[in-house]
């Protein structure tokens, strides 16, 4: 069984326009700082973050609770102007966990609306984890 959390920057496109016409360096620096903070926050909880796209990340989050996710969201909120949504999925394998997270967000299945956290949680860490490779 695997629990997977997908993190996506909300309002990324419109936000990039606020940086002006010469913004690529600003975007690159923001993305690297955000990735660093995500990796730092999740690794403290024994998880690993992967970059999916410039505005999307995913993490294997077996054992993380809703409160753990909220704590990370609070850390991010205090550090960045941009916001992230989190979609948590749970399944027999990474593919099923990804589908579960996607469906939860698509159907607006909130676990915590204030911090934009959608999904399904297991919260157990005793299961072995299968890592997916993109």
Predicted regions and their residues:
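Regulatory and interdomain segments flanking nucleotide-handling catalytic cores
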Residues: 1-134
């Amino acid at each position: 069984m695997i629990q997977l959390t997908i993190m996506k920057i909300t309002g990324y496109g419109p936000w990039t326009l606020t940086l002006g016409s010469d913004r690529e360096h600003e975007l690159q620096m923001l993305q690297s700082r955000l990735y660093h903070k995500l990796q730092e926050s999740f690794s403290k909880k024994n998880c690993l973050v992967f970059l999916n796209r410039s505005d999307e990340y995913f993490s294997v989050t077996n054992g993380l609770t809703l409160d753990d996710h909220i704590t990370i969201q609070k850390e991010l909120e205090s550090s960045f102007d941009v916001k992230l949504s989190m979609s948590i999925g749970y399944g027999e394998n990474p593919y099923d966990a990804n589908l579960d997270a996607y469906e939860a967000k698509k159907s607006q299945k909130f676990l915590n609306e204030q911090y934009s956290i959608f999904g399904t949680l297991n919260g157990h860490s005793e299961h072995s984890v299968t890592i997916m490779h993109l």
